[in-house]
Regions:
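Gly/Ala-rich beta-loop-alpha elbow adjacent to hydrolase catalytic centers
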Residues: 62, 66
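Patatin-like phospholipase
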Residues: 1-61, 71-308
Length: 308
């Protein structure tokens, strides 16, 4: 049974597989550090306050920072957490537990640099980053898991929730669901384990790192075939020539085209701008929250029409 669950975690990236078929509304939430956690929470809560029933999503896909928000939304706790984030934004030190330690050791910096510089998602590239993540002198895995558990406080796995991660040794994409036999906190911690910053997390017999080490920051193929999808990506409005962190130039646009070609009407949204160097800075959470709510006000009518 354990071997079956271990093997079932691996799911190749494929839009043709139409993983989202049978679902009416898919919410796809990408990575982007603490900053994007706050932005997404404020944006989605802002949409809800303006009449868009975001929590009606029957498929919620979360990657990296998005796995935390996906857990919150699928558990029906968005409104409550939005109030907490707004409060915590005024006390940045309380958010520090999720931002990693300060100065990096050389072994950590090596993994961070490899991930940041990667412009493709070839298996050898991903495995090279994974091996560096395993070798990095990071805090023990349970430290992040406990911090995530304290923030989420979710014991029962929400049926709609799917989180992503990457096997550090094989480079395979891993998808954790209600059938995987893994806690929400462990799954979200694995999805958020940035190479060199946090230790890879145990998912059954695998050691898993950030779901973004895969050529995609959203894994929107998991929504392919759904009735409609709302995709939140940190780089939604960034130049298509941008590359790094295993994504190639134009990959975001190709992914959106493939999702739509699968028969899923998709809307892509994200911040107008962001500071890549400040994504893990707790002091920037308040500004991210304000930006997310402001964008929700701009987008509410269009998203409501799309969401149905």
């Amino acid at each position: 049974m354990a071997d079956d669950r271990n093997d079932a975690l691996a799911r190749p990236i494929s839009f043709a597989a139409r993983h989202g078929a049978g679902h009416e509304r898919a919410l796809v939430l990408g990575g982007g550090g603490l900053w994007f956690v706050a932005w997404q929470v404020a944006y989605l809560d802002g949409l809800m306050k303006r009449g868009v029933p975001i929590e009606s999503a029957d498929l919620v896909v979360g990657t990296s920072a998005g796995s935390l928000v996906a857990s919150i939304v699928s558990a029906g706790r968005l409104k409550r957490v939005a109030g907490q984030v707004e409060f915590l934004a005024r006390v940045p030190a309380l958010l520090g537990v999720l931002s990693g330690d300060g100065e990096l050791q050389p072994s950590q910096q090596r993994a961070v640099d490899l991930f940041g510089a990667a412009t493709d998602a070839e298996p050898d590239t991903i495995r090279h980053i994974g091996h560096a993540a395993l070798a990095a002198q990071t805090p023990p895995p349970d430290r992040l898991r406990r911090s995530v558990a304290a923030v989420l406080a979710i014991r029962r796995w929400p049926k709609a929730l799917h989180t992503t991660a990457v096997d550090t040794f094989t480079g395979e994409r891993l998808v954790v669901t209600a059938d995987s036999g893994i806690s929400v906190a462990r799954a979200a911690a694995a999805s958020s384990s940035v190479p060199g910053i946090f230790a890879p997390q145990p998912l059954h017999d695998r050691r898993a790192m950030d779901g973004g080490v895969s050529g995609t920051g959203t894994h929107s193929d998991l929504a392919a075939g759904a009735g409609r999808a709302l995709v939140l990506s940190l780089g939604a409005n960034a130049p298509s020539t941008d590359a790094g962190m295993t994504t190639a130039p134009g990959s975001r646009e190709r992914e959106l085209e493939a999702l739509r070609a699968s028969g899923t009407p998709a809307l892509l949204r994200g911040p107008d701008s962001y500071d890549l160097t400040a994504l893990m800075d707790p002091k920037q959470v308040a500004a991210a929250f304000e930006a997310g709510d402001a964008r929700a006000e701009e987008d509410a009518a269009e998203v409501a029409d799309h969401w149905g």
